[in-house]
Each structure stands twice: as C-alpha cells, then as structure tokens.
Amino acid sequence: EFNTGILKASLAYLPLDVRSPVARMKDILSSVSGNTIVIMGTGVEDPGFGLPQLELVRITDTFDETIEDVQNMSRPSATSLAYVVFTSGSTGKPKGVMIEHRAIVRLVKSDNFPNFPSPARMSHVFNAAFDGASWEMFWMLLNGGTVVCIDYLATLDGKELAAVFAKERVNCAFLAPAMLKLYLTDAREALKNLDFLAVGGEKFDPRDAAEAMTLVRGNIANVYGPTEAGMISTCYTIPKDEAFTNGVQLGRSIYNSGAYVMDPNQQLAGLGVMGEHLFGDGVGRGYTKPELNKNRFIDVTIEGKTVRAYGTGDRMRARVGDGLLEFFGRLDNQFKMRGQRIEAGEVESAMLSHKRVLNAAIVLRGGQEEGEQLEMVGFIVADDDDNTEEEETGNQVEGWQDHFESGMYSDISTAVDQSAIGNDFKGWTSMYDGNDIDKGEMQEWLDDAIHTLHNGQVPHHVLEIGTGSGMILFNLNPGLQSYVGLDPSKSAVEFVNRAIESSPKFAGKAKVHVGMATDVNKLGELHPDLVVFNSVVQYFPTPEYLTEVIDGLIAIPSVKRIFLGDIRSYATNRHFLAARAIHTLGTNNNATKDRVRQKVQELEDREEESLVEPAFFTTLKERRPDVVKHVEVIPKNMKATNELIAYRYTAVVHLRDETDEPVYPTEKDSWIDFEEKQMDKKALLDHLRLSKDAMSVAVSNITYAHTAFERRIVESLDEDSKDDAKDTLGGAAWLSAVRSETESRASLTVPELFEIANEAGFRVEVSAARQWSQNGALDAVFHHFPSSNTDRTLIQFPTDNQLRSSLTLANRPLQKLQRRRAALQVRESLQSLVPTYMVPPNIVVLDTMPLNTNGKIDRKELTRRARTLPKQQTAAPVPDFPISDIEITLCEEATEVFGMKVEISDHFFQLGGHSLLATKLISRIQHRLHVRVTVKDVFDSPVFADLAVIIRQGLAMQNPVAEGQDKQGWSSRVAPRTEVEKM
C-alpha cells in the first residue's frame, strides 16, 4: 500500500534493506538529492544516519496522522520517476537506477504471461531492496491479484514455506534460480500447487527447470532483464517438450520492451550471430549519477529510427529458425548470484579499503556441475602484521607446552607402566586416522633411530631437547657418562626424573629440566658431545626459531654432532597430504581428482606443525663453514610402511673437531639416473656386479617405494590443474589407473638398497638430500671406501642448496594463522560495507598476485587456484547470537582463546583454529562445564553451534535428567535447543 500510495502521489520510493551495513545505506541516501523521508518498520532501530534533509518516520506513527486534503496535487505521467534501486557498481560504490512509471505499466500487462491464473495469489519472498520485489507486488496488485508477504525466516525453511503456501493458497511465485534449487529439495510441496512460476535473476539451470516441470501444475516462465531495463524484459514460457538446447532460452521481449542483439558497431546482428544484448523501449531514466550513463545508456538506430537503449553487457544471440534469445555469459566482470547482480569491481574496491590489503581480485568457481552453486572467491595480498609476529611465536611455543602438559603427558604417571619405560610410545598416533600406530612398527622405528644416533659409537655426554617420556634416554648405550634433558612438560619431567632415580644405570648421571629449546643457556656450564632432537623440530614455531636454537648449540665448544630425528619433510608433504586425503575420502568414487585436490588444500591450510626441507640443514655448511663440517640427510631404514617411515628423515650435523674422519666426494658426471635408465632391482644388481672393482658407484633418482603411489597421485593432480581438464575417470577408476601405472615403474626401499649392496659386495650410503628436486626419490652411493670406527661413511652427496631460496625451505604455520586472521579481518570489514550476498565465503591471502603477460591480474590462474580450494563448512542457518547457556559459555571461552569476539555461527578453522587452540579450548570447556569433550569433537564439528550440540549431549549422558532436574543443576541454566537453533 505504501508503494502504490507513493506512486499515486507522484513521488518516488527507494527500497532499503535493514540488514545492509549502515555505511552502505548512508552512501545510498547521500547520493539522493532533495528532501528524503525514510519510513521504518516496527522494531527497526534508528540507524543514526545523521544526514541533512533526511527525516525518519516510523510506519506506525503515520496511522494516527490526520491528513489534510491536498489541493492541486500533480498526477504522475508515464515518464514520472517511480522508484530508484541501487545495484552493485564497478567503482566500489553502489549506483542508483531510476525507473519510470511506464516501465511498471509495461511490466504488469497481464498478456505478457499466457494462462494467467484467476484469482491469483502471489508470494512475496524477495528482499524489498531487490527490484524483483517490485514485480511481485505491482504485477499482482495492478492485475487484481493478492500479494502474500512471507517472513524471511520462513523462506529458509522448506516445511514452513510449504505450510504458508498451503494456508494462504499461494498459486503464483517468482523465485531466483538458487531459491528454486533449494526448494526442489526442501519445499517440493510448496511447488505442487502453483499455477504459475516465474524464475529469474540469474542463469536458470535446465536440470532444475526439468525437475520443476514435474512438480508445478501450471506454466513455468524464464524471465530476464536487468534493473536498468525495468527488471523483466524478456519471457520464455517453457513448453512441456522442451529439449533445453543451449540451456533455458530467454525467449522474446514482453510488451513494449524492445530486445536487440547488436554487433560491436551497434548494428543489428543476424540470426545465430553473437552480440551484446540491448534493450530499447522501457529502459530506465538512467543512473542517479549521470556520468555513469556513458556507454551504458546509448542511442542506437533500429530500422531507421533512433532508439534509446541500455547495453546489458550480456553475450547473446537470436536463435536461427525461431529468433528466440539465448544467453552465453557476460562480456565484463559483472555476474549474478542468488538473483543479485554483483560487480566484481565493487567487491574488490571494498576489500582494498581495508588498511592491510595491497591488492585484491574476485573470481568465480562452480556452477558447472549438477547441484553445484556458483561461488565467489576473493584473493588478496595483505601487508604483514609485524607487530604480532613475536607475540604469535611466543603463543605458539606456549601452546605446545599446554598441549604436552594438559594433553599428551597429563596422565603419564598412571598411563605408563614402569616396565615399559623407554618403549611406551605414549601419544604416537597415526595422522591418517588418529589410532595408535602398531607397536611393532614403533619398535622398529625406535631401533632405527637409536642405531642411527649411535652410529657405532658410544656418546659420552648427551644433551637432549625434548626428552618426552624418555624413549631416547633409556635406550642409550651403557657407556653414557652424563645426560641433561629439557622438556616443556612438568609432568613428563617429574616422571622421567623418578625413573632415573630408580635406575642403577642412569641414577646420578642423568637429569631432566623443565624448559624450552631456547633455555639451554639457563642450564649452566654444559659439555655435551652429542645433542639430540628427536621428533621435536615440528613443534618449533618458525624457521628462524630453529636457526636460533641450532646457532646456540654449535656455539658450545664440546659439541661434535647434532642429531635431528623424525623431521617432517616439507619437500614431500603434498605426497603425504594426498595419502591422507585418499584415506579420508576412501578409494571409491568419492575420491575424484577435484575432491582429492580440495582435501589436500584443506589439510595443508590446517597444518600447524613445522615442516622442514633437507636443504635447510645441508645449507648449514655454507652458512657456517667455520663450524659445520658435514651434514647427512638419512631416510628411515625400515621394512614397515607408515607416515613415520615414508615422510620423515634424520639430519645429522657434524661439527669440526680434532678428529680427521674423511668426507668422500662424488664426481658430478659419474651419477647414473635410476629412473632415466629405467632400471629395476635386477638391473641395478647386475650393474653393480659388473662394476665390482670400482671404488664407488653413484646412483641417483631412485624412486622411493614407500611414497611412489602418492607421488604419482600428486603428479596426476598437477597435470590436470595446468589446464581446464575435467575428470575423465571416476575416483575408483582413476586411483586404480594410478596404482597400475605406479606398479609398472620400478621402485625400491632403503632395506632393499642394503640387500642389493650386500649381494653385490658393496657397502652403501643412502641420502634423501634431494627430495625436492627428485620428487621424493633417493640417492645411493655403493662403495669400497675404507672403514672407520663408525657404521656410516661420510660422503658428499649432491644437494638442493643452489636451487631454492632460503625462504622456501620450511613452511610457516604462524604465517598461515596470520593470513587466516587477515582474511577474517577483511571479511568483517566487508560485512560492514556491502550486503551479505557480496561477501565471498572464501578469502585467500597470497604472497603476490599472479599477473599475465600484459601485466594484468591473471584471473584464469586465480580461477584455477579457486577450484582447488575446499568448500567452506557452514552451519545450518542459525542466529549469530548464542541462545542457550551452553552456547553463551562456549562463545565466551572461544573468545578468550582466539582473542576476538566469537559468534555461535562461526567456524573454528575459519577463525584460524588449529589443534593447539582446540586443546586450549577443550581444557577451558571441561573446567567450566565439567563435561567430557575432545579435540576430535572440535575437528568433527568445527561450527560452534554444532559443537554446542555435542557438549549438550555429553552433559546429558553424564548427568541424566530426573524429574526435570539435572544432577549438576544445569537444567536451570541450560535452555533446551530451540526450533530456530535446530533450523
């Protein structure tokens, strides 16, 4: 009624969405000239625009106003302004489109749509600020129909919507394609009684059209038109026998709406010829800022007459034979999502307005596959927040300390039997599924670590960083004279010290202290000849931290060797992630290339441990030639197959001392490439037997059997990601093909190399120093060099030192955390500047923006990257505010953990969460709510609303309710989960 009253008064209206950011609404109102009245609905708070010539009036106040007769009120004409709608603008500001009365009259002519039902009752589901809402209202009201206004929350609930449709006898509807797709799943009953369904606002999926035709009893029309041409300008009533060639047709222009396809010279294009779609009759007056009209509102000559037209930027053609219009995409960076038109430039400008954003770009992904929604992905280059790096480093170190103290070693005194000390393997779980690693495999792993550490010698004085439960300490040779250990867990330190005191072998020789790796200088004067880090480096926060620790240790005069065991390899990490992805997805058809690619990216984004390449250690000799004599990079010598063997290695740093142990060189041209020569086990053995008199035989690029399959998986993913290739095989068939190809190529394990050497009469040294350049392959030197007093002979293997920047030799988990926070900050900023539908669900922070050969942003490359991103997990629609006491408590504790306000609809990982923060959050929840909840619960239910359900279920199991009263008194403080929450 207000809209029609405004039009009858020869005034114009401007619809606003109360859910839009105040800043955006203020921008819109500021661009409108003249006196403005803003009518507010019941319950809407005063936004405080503070603009001159602006009056705020509550709709309820107008009901009591006494209206005087207005004399000589001018009547509106066909060219009077009817309304102004603001759409996304490429300049970064919304642009207002002025629509005249004639466009409305043109639009609501009933003969535009044949078989129009009578009586007609039309659902009003569109946002009032969307121009589709004007058609819902005026088409019905001006044709004698009824408009049924439906609450926003009801439009999100299929059952509720169907109930409203049935109760109000709705028989006409106008839906955006995305809404229809939702209702085809959740509100099928609502569609069955429709005599007319119009679908428009974005591209109509023909699969949805075909399915809707099986439900809707009346006609279905595909309607099309930009805001500038009065919302709807073409219509295609879909016939029952439609074949959907080239998608759903746009049809023909409606009453008084000229629709033309023009070539670049503004001449009419012939049938079947691509061109730009222009509208003539019925176009709007123009933009509120006249300078924006250029190249959009233009004059064209049609059949000798000058016609004012609007260029849509849509790529079209008129079909040969019947002249029906067909849509083939955009000519610019404008697109539609969920019926809303979006200029990529406006979103990019909004992102660039954030102080940390240096560059920004928007691309689209999805929309091609059945049921797949079109989705925006934002890419930004952000300025590093240097002020937080030192603080984050400290937080990461403290986080691991909390993890060990309150997690892994919290129950060490009772969980580890005295007879198992040194072989307890507490906390050693598989990264594939979280289950304990087989004890036999763990024992083989430990035996190999001790054998490599001893190297045929007896270490006399040992310093260990990260004693843990004492696995290294209690397996050292009897010749040990002194041992000093450091560990961040007080519980573990007390446990090991008690075990030392009760052991005649170690009592009086060993002592463990609470401390971090950087606390060595606090231990007083030390004289270790061997320093041990075993399975510790991954917990260091940054490469710089690791460098600082190593530099401090090599400065101790007595140190001869630094043993760094169980290092997670950065070079082969993608192989490992591929293995985890396939394990998660299964070997059936779920493991398609796209899903594996996305899962790999998801796992990589969640990584919180430090991964280091071998070159990080081999470059120590170049960086400190005065101190470092040699660096070995040694793969695990084990028969078992698990992630500890396949994706970890040992680095042994030998420092210069008075001993004269030689390091044997290898000639660059003497290496035989195992893969290039297509060798196998037999061919290698034969070659060695023929070379039995040689001092050494160097073989490079030996495919590592433990990772060969995963390596080929990654190669296959990379091959396809370089272009737009689609999966030609299902998941199971693809994996089977890769496995067959892997099995057709020869590969070897480290034990097999030792067996071959033994059979051929050689000794062998194996190196993993070139994991990066050789894609995980190994080097081996079979030799007859003179034996020394050690098990291994030092050989100068080739390295990757010259091929890599030092910045790429390790990952930076803290940097990922900072980037996630930067993305979160930009998202929060966007939410205050643009409507929700313009906020990309995925915002990715890049080091640099990729450029094409013209020096412009390479959007094709960004689109390729966007395809690999994991789909964001989101909760079902729930209010942002917590409802129950449990949710309030959860949000409070999460806010403390993250240091920022957390809402119940937030996602743990999208906020930058990882297992350390999960451990901290769980600890706080357990203390506050006295409920058993695990880190796995957080990982399985990362949306806080879903996690609250898990907590509620845990409380219910612990404290069954008797006669409405929880044993812990929680029933008085915890409200039952509401229907809104469940929705």
UniProtKB/Swiss-Prot annotation:
Region feature (Adenylation): 5-338
SUPFAM superfamilies recorded: Acetyl-CoA synthetase-like, ACP-like, S-adenosyl-L-methionine-dependent methyltransferases
Annotated segments matching region Disordered: 961-983
Keyword Kinase set for record: no
Description of its domains: NRP synthetases are composed of discrete domains (adenylation (A), thiolation (T) or peptidyl carrier protein (PCP) and condensation (C) domains) which when grouped together are referred to as a single module. Each module is responsible for the recognition (via the A domain) and incorporation of a single amino acid into the growing peptide product. Thus, an NRP synthetase is generally composed of one or more modules and can terminate in a thioesterase domain (TE) that releases the newly synthesized peptide from the enzyme.
Listed EC numbers: 6.3.2.-, 2.1.1.-
PROSITE patterns in the record: AMP_BINDING, CARRIER, PHOSPHOPANTETHEINE
Cofactor: pantetheine 4'-phosphate
Known function: Nonribosomal peptide synthetase that synthesizes enniatin by coupling three D-hydroxycarboxylic acids and three L-amino acids via amide and ester bonds in an alternating fashion. Whereas ESYN1 can accept different amino acids as precursors (L -valine, L-isoleucine or L-leucine), only one species of D-hydroxycarboxylic acid can be found in natural enniatin isolates (D-hydroxyisovaleric acid, D-Hiv). D-Hiv stems from L-valine deanimation by a valine aminotransferase to 2-keto-isovaleric acid (2-Kiv), which becomes subsequently reduced by a keto-isovaleric acid reductase (KivR) to D-Hiv.
Entry similarity comment: Belongs to the ATP-dependent AMP-binding enzyme family.
Species of provenance: Gibberella pulicaris
Residue ranges constituting the Carrier domain according to the UniProt record: 881-955
Keywords for this protein: Ligase, Methyltransferase, Multifunctional enzyme, Phosphopantetheine, Phosphoprotein, Repeat, Transferase
Renumbered residue ranges of the record's region S-adenosyl-L-methionine-dependent N-methyltransferase: 398-554
Applied relevance: Enniatins have antimicrobial, antiviral and cytotoxic properties. The bioactivity of enniatins can be linked to their inhibition of drug efflux pumps.
One record GO biological process: secondary metabolite biosynthetic process
Cofactor descriptive note: Binds 6 phosphopantetheines covalently.
Annotated positions of the O-(pantetheine 4'-phosphoryl)serine modification: 915
Source taxon at top rank: Eukaryota
Pathway membership, UniProt: Antibiotic biosynthesis; enniatin biosynthesis
Record GO terms (molecular function): ligase activity; methyltransferase activity; phosphopantetheine binding; S-adenosylmethionine-dependent methyltransferase activity
Protein name per Swiss-Prot or TrEMBL: Enniatin synthase
GO cellular component terms given for this protein: cytoplasm
